């Protein structure tokens, strides 16, 4: 599946690595960040950055940021919401592409 933009729902080194690869592939990268990370390298590296009013664990805010930015897909990185089957389902139900294992696989991994 091909897309032109992704929102990276993570921070730090993993966000930088995801963005580096995606930008090499010609994909626009959108970062989300909290105030404490406003000057972090991953925010500066992104083509666009959206400040979250809460935390990296606020799935609804992340989906809202994806819609606001026009992102076509969400890459969760690791940790945070990457192992949350309900979040993966919510991403898909909002007509966004989930870059990661299916919600079913995430649930099975947790059992």
How would you name each of these model-derived features?
Residues 1-111:
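N-terminal beta-alpha lobe that positions the nucleotide/phosphoryl donor
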């Amino acid at each position: 599946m091909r897309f032109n933009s992704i929102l990276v729902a993570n921070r730090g080194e993993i966000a930088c690595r995801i963005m580096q690869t995606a930008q090499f592939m010609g994909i626009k990268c959108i970062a989300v960040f909290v105030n404490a990370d406003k000057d972090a390298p991953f925010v500066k590296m992104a083509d666009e950055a959206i400040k979250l009013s809460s935390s990296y664990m606020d799935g609804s805010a992340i989906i809202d940021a994806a819609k606001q930015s026009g992102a076509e897909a969400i890459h969760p990185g690791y940790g945070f919401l990457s192992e949350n089957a309900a979040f993966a389902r919510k991403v898909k139900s909002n007509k966004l592409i989930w870059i990661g294992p299916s919600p079913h696989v995430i649930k099975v991994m947790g059992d």
